[in-house]
């Protein structure tokens, strides 16, 4: 986050050290027309939803090149995201755990609300996901969410959500995909 990056920068530079601190990230994966879509889909599942999306290097934006690739990618992602088993760490079959705090859960669900309000297509909605085991209903669980037709002026594109939300931004050619990065 930006406050943490400022803290690291201030602390480091106050001792005369050179510091470079990146406080936020929107990591993109470009999927070209000749890509192996099964491989790309599997890579996206781990990169976007591993650690409940709460890691600095999570892929939060998929950039398929051409609408044909975008449509096929979304079609492959939907059943995989819907099948994610969400649960506590004591459930060995759980594929994704809870978010870290209730405040963060509210932040992530707020971004999903914003995405819908700004006109992105919510293809998979993870907001009402229940955990895999009884007794954990008060945890901060959220399932994977997938947006399509996201544009670079939307808050879900511009801001780091730091949660299990994947945005699909369609590009018509390689150069326009690279321009997004």
Question: Model features per residue range: what roles?
Answer:
Residues 164:
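Glycine-rich nucleotide-phosphate-binding loops and adjacent flexible coil segments
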Residues 2-151, 173-181:
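ALDH superfamily catalytic-core signature
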Residues 160-161:
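Short, surface-exposed loop/turn microsegments at beta-strand edges and helix-strand junctions
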Residues 167-169:
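Active-site donor-binding acidic/aromatic loop of nucleotide-activated sugar
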């Amino acid at each position: 986050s930006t406050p943490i990056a400022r803290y690291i920068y201030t602390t480091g530079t106050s001792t005369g050290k050179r510091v470079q601190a990146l406080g936020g990230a929107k990591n993109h994966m470009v999927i070209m027309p000749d890509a192996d879509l099964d491989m790309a889909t599997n890579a996206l599942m781990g990169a976007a939803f591993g650690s409940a999306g709460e890691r600095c290097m999570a892929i939060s934006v998929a950039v398929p090149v051409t609408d044909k690739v975008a449509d096929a990618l979304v079609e492959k992602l939907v059943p995989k995201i819907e099948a994610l088993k969400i649960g506590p760490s004591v459930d060995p079959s759980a594929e994704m755990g809870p978010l870290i705090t209730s405040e963060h859960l509210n932040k992530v669900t707020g971004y999903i609300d914003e995405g819908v309000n700004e006109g992105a297509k919510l293809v998979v909605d993870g907001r009402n996901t229940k955990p895999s085991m009884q007794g954990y209903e008060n945890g901060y669980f959220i399932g994977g969410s997938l947006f399509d037709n996201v544009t670079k002026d939307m808050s879900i594109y511009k801001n780091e959500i730091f949660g299990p939300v994947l945005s699909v931004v369609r590009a018509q050619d390689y150069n326009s995909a690279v321009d997004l990065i």
